[in-house]
């Protein structure tokens, strides 16, 4: 349940929002945002939801066998550009494939040279409007490459006050970043997120042109012996066509922007009473309390927008990410169930299920692309989509055609 401080803020967020549920199938310009992701009655069920709840059809793209990609891991990163070329980060490299899945090239080399990357930190940042990619070069600087692999220069990640910037998105001529935290002293009263959740800089003059306020900055905890947070901290983000969605991992509002200057609250999570809140999560993060002190308490993890609703991951605070329950909540309806079992594939007989939104995926132009390990096609009840596919083959790219909004189909 929510603590009193966070609850007051949360209630203020919801005031005036619920009418959106009565208008959800109208044109976006006519709908009162944000949409409510209502999980207040969410139950955990062994019965999985269906891919057909949000997708109309499924197809498959065979990737070249060279270079060899190891068995799919959660560390993979997937991107598809406006020409449907495919980019897969595996280990220290980013591989480019054409729309048919044929390998083209690696976009940069690993090494000590001025145009090379020593060791990439995190995932690459793609700019779909200006067709380039940013790579965090060992935390020293960000290197920029065109999507053809041409080196375009670099810029430092540390400002004049020794603050480290971590860039996570790029839209038009602007970059979105957050400042990495300064390690607090034991006993210090702190909100590790700071007064702003993220910042936007202009690429033309390297100036900060927007700051997203942290409206829960007044909630603080006492630094204990350690810091503890998951690899997703502090932000979830999705770039879908011209829209960028951002949410702090401990907060309830998902913001949407098309220009990185105007951020609209697009979705708000309405929690179940068993869910934890920002105050408890911040206390756990800075070591003011331990996860074992909040057994049986749950958290909403990833939320991935789709045209007709959202995919979400949900789990006990003491559980592992890979063990998250997953579900789909249709716009205007309540999320009633989530399941530890993957979404059942009722669109064809090649694949039994898909572990969305936890598996590696990317959305563009009404399609959801998902990387799937080949052993999944050899489970009982499944069959490979290609006759020469083996369990040792490179992963297959699944292409789900997503259902459209009502206003787009009438």
Residue ranges and their predicted role:
Residues 17-410:
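Eukaryotic scaffold repeat domains enriched in small/polar residues
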């Amino acid at each position: 349940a929510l603590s009193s401080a966070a609850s007051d803020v949360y209630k203020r967020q919801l005031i005036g929002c619920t009418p959106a549920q009565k208008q959800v199938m109208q044109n976006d310009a006519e709908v009162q945002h944000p949409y409510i992701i209502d999980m207040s009655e969410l139950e955990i069920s062994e019965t999985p939801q269906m891919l057909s709840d949000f997708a109309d059809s499924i197809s498959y793209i065979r990737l070249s066998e060279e270079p060899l990609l190891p068995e799919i891991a959660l560390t993979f990163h997937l991107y598809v550009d406006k020409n449907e070329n495919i980019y897969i980060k595996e280990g220290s490299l980013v591989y480019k494939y054409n729309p048919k899945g044929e390998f083209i090239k690696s976009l940069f080399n690993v090494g000590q040279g001025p145009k090379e990357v020593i060791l990439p930190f995190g995932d690459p940042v793609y700019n779909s409007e200006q067709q380039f990619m940013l790579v965090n070069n060992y935390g020293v600087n960000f290197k920029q490459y065109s999507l053809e692999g041409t080196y375009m220069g670099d810029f430092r990640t540390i400002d004049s006050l020794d603050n480290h910037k971590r860039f996570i998105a790029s839209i038009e001529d602007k970059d979105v970043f957050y400042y990495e935290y300064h390690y607090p002293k034991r006993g210090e009263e702190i909100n590790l997120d700071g007064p702003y959740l993220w910042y936007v800089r202009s690429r033309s003059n390297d100036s900060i042109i927007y700051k997203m306020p942290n409206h829960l900055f007044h909630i603080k905890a006492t630094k204990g012996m350690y810091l503890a947070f998951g690899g997703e901290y502090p932000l979830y983000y999705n770039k879908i066509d011209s829209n960028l969605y951002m949410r702090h991992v401990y907060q309830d509002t998902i913001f949407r922007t098309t220009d990185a200057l105007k951020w609209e609250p697009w979705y708000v999570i309405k929690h179940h009473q068993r869910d934890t809140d920002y105050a408890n999560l911040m206390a756990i993060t800075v070591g003011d309390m331990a996860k074992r002190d909040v057994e049986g308490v749950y958290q909403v993890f990833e939320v991935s927008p789709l045209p007709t609703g959202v995919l979400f991951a949900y789990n006990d605070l003491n559980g592992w990410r890979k063990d998250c329950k997953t579900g789909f909540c249709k716009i205007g309806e309540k999320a009633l169930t989530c399941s530890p079992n993957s979404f059942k594939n009722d669109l064809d007989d090649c694949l039994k299920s898909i572990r969305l939104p936890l598996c590696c995926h990317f959305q563009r132009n009404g399609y959801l692309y998902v990387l799937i390990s080949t052993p999944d096609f050899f489970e009982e009840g499944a069959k490979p989509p290609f006759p020469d596919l083996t369990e040792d083959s490179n992963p297959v790219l699944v292409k789900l055609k997503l259902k459209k909004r009502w206003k787009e189909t009438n």
